[in-house]
Protein backbone atom coordinates (compact mmCIF):
# COMPACT_ATOMS: atom_id res chain seq x y z
CA UNK A 1 0.00 0.00 0.00
CA UNK A 2 1.20 3.55 -0.71
CA UNK A 3 -0.31 7.04 -0.63
CA UNK A 4 -0.44 9.66 -3.37
CA UNK A 5 -2.17 12.95 -2.46
CA UNK A 6 -5.67 12.05 -1.23
CA UNK A 7 -5.50 8.52 -2.68
CA UNK A 8 -4.29 5.23 -1.28
CA UNK A 9 -3.38 2.26 -3.47
CA UNK A 10 -3.99 -1.19 -2.09
CA UNK A 11 -2.78 -4.34 -3.85
CA UNK A 12 -4.10 -7.80 -3.08
CA UNK A 13 -2.30 -10.84 -4.44
CA UNK A 14 -3.86 -13.76 -2.65
CA UNK A 15 -3.02 -16.34 -5.27
CA UNK A 16 -0.74 -16.83 -8.22
CA UNK A 17 -3.67 -16.71 -10.58
CA UNK A 18 -5.15 -13.42 -9.53
CA UNK A 19 -4.04 -9.94 -8.50
CA UNK A 20 -6.55 -7.32 -7.44
CA UNK A 21 -5.67 -3.61 -7.17
CA UNK A 22 -7.83 -1.09 -5.36
CA UNK A 23 -7.67 2.69 -5.55
CA UNK A 24 -9.17 4.34 -2.49
CA UNK A 25 -9.71 8.10 -2.88
CA UNK A 26 -10.92 10.39 -0.11
CA UNK A 27 -12.51 13.73 -0.81
CA UNK A 28 -12.57 16.10 2.19
CA UNK A 29 -14.00 19.21 0.57
CA UNK A 30 -16.86 19.19 3.03
CA UNK A 31 -15.57 19.91 6.52
CA UNK A 32 -17.48 17.08 8.21
CA UNK A 33 -18.13 14.72 5.32
CA UNK A 34 -15.76 12.24 3.76
CA UNK A 35 -16.43 10.71 0.37
CA UNK A 36 -14.67 7.42 -0.22
CA UNK A 37 -14.33 6.18 -3.78
CA UNK A 38 -13.13 2.62 -4.35
CA UNK A 39 -11.98 1.68 -7.81
CA UNK A 40 -11.09 -1.96 -8.42
CA UNK A 41 -8.73 -3.26 -11.06
CA UNK A 42 -8.15 -7.00 -11.35
CA UNK A 43 -6.19 -9.37 -13.53
CA UNK A 44 -7.58 -12.57 -14.96
CA UNK A 45 -7.98 -15.42 -12.62
CA UNK A 46 -10.63 -17.45 -10.84
CA UNK A 47 -10.22 -17.29 -6.98
CA UNK A 48 -13.55 -15.84 -5.71
CA UNK A 49 -12.54 -16.50 -2.12
CA UNK A 50 -9.38 -14.49 -2.58
CA UNK A 51 -11.39 -11.63 -4.07
CA UNK A 52 -13.63 -11.57 -1.00
CA UNK A 53 -10.58 -11.36 1.23
CA UNK A 54 -9.28 -8.53 -0.88
CA UNK A 55 -12.54 -6.64 -0.55
CA UNK A 56 -12.49 -7.05 3.22
CA UNK A 57 -9.02 -5.58 3.20
CA UNK A 58 -10.06 -2.53 1.25
CA UNK A 59 -13.11 -1.97 3.49
CA UNK A 60 -10.87 -1.97 6.55
CA UNK A 61 -8.48 0.36 4.76
CA UNK A 62 -11.34 2.74 3.96
CA UNK A 63 -12.43 2.82 7.62
CA UNK A 64 -8.89 3.54 8.77
CA UNK A 65 -8.64 6.24 6.12
CA UNK A 66 -11.83 7.93 7.31
CA UNK A 67 -10.63 7.97 10.92
CA UNK A 68 -7.16 9.20 10.05
CA UNK A 69 -8.29 11.93 7.69
CA UNK A 70 -10.89 13.18 10.15
CA UNK A 71 -8.14 13.70 12.73
CA UNK A 72 -5.80 15.33 10.22
CA UNK A 73 -8.59 17.57 8.92
CA UNK A 74 -9.55 18.96 12.32
CA UNK A 75 -5.90 19.62 13.10
CA UNK A 76 -5.64 21.50 9.80
CA UNK A 77 -8.75 23.57 10.58
CA UNK A 78 -7.30 24.49 13.94
CA UNK A 79 -4.15 25.77 12.27
CA UNK A 80 -6.23 28.38 10.46
CA UNK A 81 -6.67 30.36 13.67
CA UNK A 82 -3.31 29.67 15.29
CA UNK A 83 -2.08 33.15 14.35
CA UNK A 84 -4.94 34.75 16.28
CA UNK A 85 -5.43 34.99 20.03
CA UNK A 86 -9.19 34.59 20.42
CA UNK A 87 -9.31 34.21 24.21
CA UNK A 88 -8.49 36.36 27.22
CA UNK A 89 -7.44 34.42 30.33
CA UNK A 90 -9.11 31.30 28.95
CA UNK A 91 -12.40 33.04 28.16
CA UNK A 92 -13.51 33.17 24.53
CA UNK A 93 -15.30 36.18 23.08
CA UNK A 94 -17.32 36.84 19.92
CA UNK A 95 -16.20 39.73 17.73
CA UNK A 96 -18.27 42.79 18.69
CA UNK A 97 -16.21 45.58 17.14
CA UNK A 98 -12.88 46.07 15.38
CA UNK A 99 -9.99 48.45 15.93
CA UNK A 100 -9.96 49.58 12.30
CA UNK A 101 -7.93 52.76 12.62
CA UNK A 102 -10.52 54.28 10.30
CA UNK A 103 -13.96 55.80 10.82
CA UNK A 104 -15.85 52.71 9.70
CA UNK A 105 -19.12 51.17 10.86
CA UNK A 106 -20.89 47.96 9.87
CA UNK A 107 -24.68 47.74 9.60
CA UNK A 108 -25.94 44.22 10.34
CA UNK A 109 -29.55 43.06 9.96
CA UNK A 110 -31.04 39.82 11.28
CA UNK A 111 -33.52 37.68 9.36
CA UNK A 112 -34.89 34.97 11.62
CA UNK A 113 -37.78 33.49 9.67
CA UNK A 114 -40.19 34.07 12.54
CA UNK A 115 -42.01 36.85 10.68
CA UNK A 116 -42.72 36.75 6.96
CA UNK A 117 -42.55 40.52 6.50
CA UNK A 118 -41.15 40.85 3.00
CA UNK A 119 -42.56 44.35 2.66
CA UNK A 120 -40.38 45.66 5.51
CA UNK A 121 -37.29 43.96 4.07
CA UNK A 122 -37.92 45.36 0.59
CA UNK A 123 -38.43 48.84 2.07
CA UNK A 124 -35.14 48.49 3.95
CA UNK A 125 -33.33 47.43 0.78
CA UNK A 126 -34.65 50.50 -0.99
CA UNK A 127 -33.35 52.77 1.78
CA UNK A 128 -29.95 51.06 1.79
CA UNK A 129 -29.75 51.57 -1.96
CA UNK A 130 -30.69 55.25 -1.68
CA UNK A 131 -28.19 55.84 1.13
CA UNK A 132 -25.51 53.76 -0.66
CA UNK A 133 -25.00 51.55 2.39
CA UNK A 134 -23.42 48.10 1.96
CA UNK A 135 -24.74 45.84 4.72
CA UNK A 136 -24.43 42.37 6.20
CA UNK A 137 -27.58 40.27 6.65
CA UNK A 138 -27.44 37.43 9.17
CA UNK A 139 -30.10 34.93 8.11
CA UNK A 140 -31.26 31.56 9.37
CA UNK A 141 -31.35 28.62 6.99
CA UNK A 142 -35.15 28.44 7.29
CA UNK A 143 -35.54 32.11 6.33
CA UNK A 144 -33.47 31.62 3.18
CA UNK A 145 -35.42 28.50 2.25
CA UNK A 146 -38.73 30.38 2.66
CA UNK A 147 -37.55 33.61 1.01
CA UNK A 148 -35.14 32.46 -1.65
CA UNK A 149 -35.94 35.16 -4.23
CA UNK A 150 -35.59 37.91 -1.63
CA UNK A 151 -32.27 36.45 -0.45
CA UNK A 152 -30.99 36.53 -4.03
CA UNK A 153 -32.17 40.13 -4.33
CA UNK A 154 -30.19 41.05 -1.21
CA UNK A 155 -27.01 39.62 -2.72
CA UNK A 156 -27.62 41.16 -6.13
CA UNK A 157 -27.87 44.57 -4.49
CA UNK A 158 -24.30 44.21 -3.22
CA UNK A 159 -24.96 43.10 0.35
CA UNK A 160 -23.69 39.91 1.96
CA UNK A 161 -25.56 37.12 3.72
CA UNK A 162 -23.98 35.33 6.68
CA UNK A 163 -25.22 32.70 9.12
CA UNK A 164 -27.69 33.23 11.96
CA UNK A 165 -28.44 30.42 14.39
CA UNK A 166 -31.98 29.11 14.28
CA UNK A 167 -31.62 27.03 17.43
CA UNK A 168 -34.56 27.27 19.81
CA UNK A 169 -32.49 26.18 22.82
CA UNK A 170 -30.46 28.58 24.94
CA UNK A 171 -26.74 28.64 24.33
CA UNK A 172 -25.99 26.63 27.50
CA UNK A 173 -27.83 23.69 25.93
CA UNK A 174 -26.18 23.95 22.52
CA UNK A 175 -23.62 21.19 22.04
CA UNK A 176 -20.51 21.35 19.89
CA UNK A 177 -22.00 18.69 17.62
CA UNK A 178 -25.22 20.69 17.11
CA UNK A 179 -23.18 23.81 16.43
CA UNK A 180 -21.06 22.06 13.77
CA UNK A 181 -24.18 20.65 12.14
CA UNK A 182 -25.85 24.05 12.01
CA UNK A 183 -22.74 25.70 10.56
CA UNK A 184 -22.67 23.13 7.77
CA UNK A 185 -26.40 23.60 7.09
CA UNK A 186 -25.96 27.37 6.91
CA UNK A 187 -23.00 27.07 4.54
CA UNK A 188 -24.91 24.77 2.23
CA UNK A 189 -28.12 26.83 2.31
CA UNK A 190 -26.43 30.21 1.84
CA UNK A 191 -24.38 28.65 -0.95
CA UNK A 192 -27.60 28.19 -2.95
CA UNK A 193 -28.15 31.96 -3.24
CA UNK A 194 -24.62 33.39 -3.38
CA UNK A 195 -21.11 32.34 -4.31
CA UNK A 196 -19.68 34.32 -1.41
CA UNK A 197 -18.63 31.99 1.44
CA UNK A 198 -20.46 31.92 4.76
CA UNK A 199 -17.69 32.47 7.32
CA UNK A 200 -19.44 34.55 9.99
CA UNK A 201 -21.91 33.16 12.53
CA UNK A 202 -24.23 34.88 14.98
CA UNK A 203 -26.48 33.68 17.78
CA UNK A 204 -29.55 35.97 17.95
CA UNK A 205 -29.45 36.67 21.69
CA UNK A 206 -25.73 37.35 21.61
CA UNK A 207 -25.09 34.74 24.31
CA UNK A 208 -22.13 32.46 23.69
CA UNK A 209 -20.22 29.98 25.82
CA UNK A 210 -16.64 28.76 25.44
CA UNK A 211 -17.65 25.45 23.86
CA UNK A 212 -19.73 27.08 21.13
CA UNK A 213 -17.13 29.77 20.44
CA UNK A 214 -14.27 27.27 20.20
CA UNK A 215 -16.35 25.08 17.91
CA UNK A 216 -17.12 28.02 15.61
CA UNK A 217 -13.44 28.96 15.41
CA UNK A 218 -12.39 25.32 14.90
CA UNK A 219 -14.75 25.07 11.93
CA UNK A 220 -12.99 27.98 10.25
CA UNK A 221 -15.78 30.45 11.03
CA UNK A 222 -15.89 33.60 13.15
CA UNK A 223 -18.55 34.39 15.79
CA UNK A 224 -19.88 37.93 15.33
CA UNK A 225 -22.05 39.82 17.81
CA UNK A 226 -22.40 43.62 17.96
CA UNK A 227 -21.23 46.63 19.94
CA UNK A 228 -24.38 48.75 19.51
CA UNK A 229 -27.91 47.33 19.62
CA UNK A 230 -30.44 49.60 17.91
CA UNK A 231 -33.31 48.13 19.97
CA UNK A 232 -35.40 48.66 16.85
CA UNK A 233 -37.94 46.14 18.09
CA UNK A 234 -39.14 48.71 20.63
CA UNK A 235 -41.98 50.70 19.17
CA UNK A 236 -41.63 54.26 20.43
CA UNK A 237 -40.81 56.05 17.19
CA UNK A 238 -37.79 55.94 14.89
CA UNK A 239 -36.67 59.47 15.72
CA UNK A 240 -36.67 58.82 19.47
CA UNK A 241 -34.88 55.51 19.01
CA UNK A 242 -32.09 57.05 16.92
CA UNK A 243 -31.72 59.86 19.45
CA UNK A 244 -31.38 57.34 22.27
CA UNK A 245 -28.79 55.34 20.30
CA UNK A 246 -26.57 58.36 19.82
CA UNK A 247 -26.98 59.54 23.42
CA UNK A 248 -26.35 56.12 24.95
CA UNK A 249 -23.27 55.17 22.95
CA UNK A 250 -20.02 56.96 22.25
CA UNK A 251 -19.12 55.90 18.72
CA UNK A 252 -15.70 54.40 18.07
CA UNK A 253 -14.07 53.23 14.87
CA UNK A 254 -15.20 49.76 13.85
CA UNK A 255 -18.57 49.65 15.59
CA UNK A 256 -20.93 46.82 14.56
CA UNK A 257 -24.58 47.92 14.66
CA UNK A 258 -27.40 45.45 15.16
CA UNK A 259 -30.84 45.80 13.55
CA UNK A 260 -33.75 43.50 12.68
CA UNK A 261 -34.49 43.61 8.96
CA UNK A 262 -38.18 42.92 9.56
CA UNK A 263 -38.65 45.63 12.20
CA UNK A 264 -41.43 48.17 11.78
CA UNK A 265 -39.13 51.16 12.35
CA UNK A 266 -35.83 49.74 11.08
CA UNK A 267 -35.83 51.32 7.64
CA UNK A 268 -36.78 54.74 8.97
CA UNK A 269 -34.17 54.49 11.72
CA UNK A 270 -31.42 53.81 9.18
CA UNK A 271 -32.58 56.69 6.98
CA UNK A 272 -32.33 59.04 9.98
CA UNK A 273 -29.14 57.63 11.50
CA UNK A 274 -26.82 57.22 8.53
CA UNK A 275 -26.77 60.86 7.34
CA UNK A 276 -25.67 61.89 10.84
CA UNK A 277 -22.91 59.28 10.94
CA UNK A 278 -21.83 60.18 7.43
CA UNK A 279 -21.61 63.82 8.44
CA UNK A 280 -19.25 62.78 11.24
CA UNK A 281 -17.03 61.08 8.67
CA UNK A 282 -18.09 57.44 9.13
CA UNK A 283 -18.05 55.05 6.18
CA UNK A 284 -20.36 52.03 6.05
CA UNK A 285 -18.67 48.70 5.21
CA UNK A 286 -19.68 45.05 5.39
CA UNK A 287 -18.56 42.74 8.18
CA UNK A 288 -16.29 40.95 5.68
CA UNK A 289 -14.59 44.24 4.88
CA UNK A 290 -14.11 45.12 8.54
CA UNK A 291 -13.08 41.93 10.35
CA UNK A 292 -9.59 40.49 9.96
CA UNK A 293 -9.17 36.70 9.91
CA UNK A 294 -5.64 36.29 11.24
CA UNK A 295 -2.93 38.04 13.24
CA UNK A 296 -5.17 39.66 15.83
CA UNK A 297 -6.02 39.57 19.53
CA UNK A 298 -9.24 40.09 21.47
CA UNK A 299 -10.22 42.35 24.36
CA UNK A 300 -12.75 41.48 27.05
CA UNK A 301 -15.44 43.65 25.45
CA UNK A 302 -15.16 41.64 22.23
CA UNK A 303 -13.08 44.24 20.41
CA UNK A 304 -10.82 42.72 17.78
CA UNK A 305 -7.34 44.26 17.65
CA UNK A 306 -5.45 43.54 14.41
CA UNK A 307 -1.72 43.09 14.88
CA UNK A 308 -1.05 46.11 12.69
CA UNK A 309 -3.19 48.32 14.93
CA UNK A 310 -1.61 46.85 18.05
CA UNK A 311 1.83 47.85 16.79
CA UNK A 312 0.57 51.32 15.93
CA UNK A 313 -0.85 51.79 19.44
CA UNK A 314 2.36 50.82 21.24
CA UNK A 315 4.86 52.28 18.78
Segment roles from a protein language model:
Residues 115-120, 169-194, 207-253, 265-272:
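Alpha-helical scaffold elements lining the catalytic groove of polysaccharide deacetylases
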Residues 78-174, 178-192, 196-197, 292:
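Active-site beta->alpha N-cap acidic-glycine motif
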Residues 64-74:
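Hydrophobic alpha-helical membrane-insertion segments, chiefly the h-region
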Residues 45-64:
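N-terminal Sec-pathway targeting helices
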Residues 11-14, 26-28, 33-38:
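Short hydrophobic alpha-helical segments enriched in small aliphatic residues
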Residues 106-108, 135-139, 160-163, 199-202, ...:
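Structural recognition of the beta-strand scaffold that forms the well-ordered cores
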Residues 88-101, 126-135, 145, 265-315:
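C-terminal domain-boundary segment and adjacent tail
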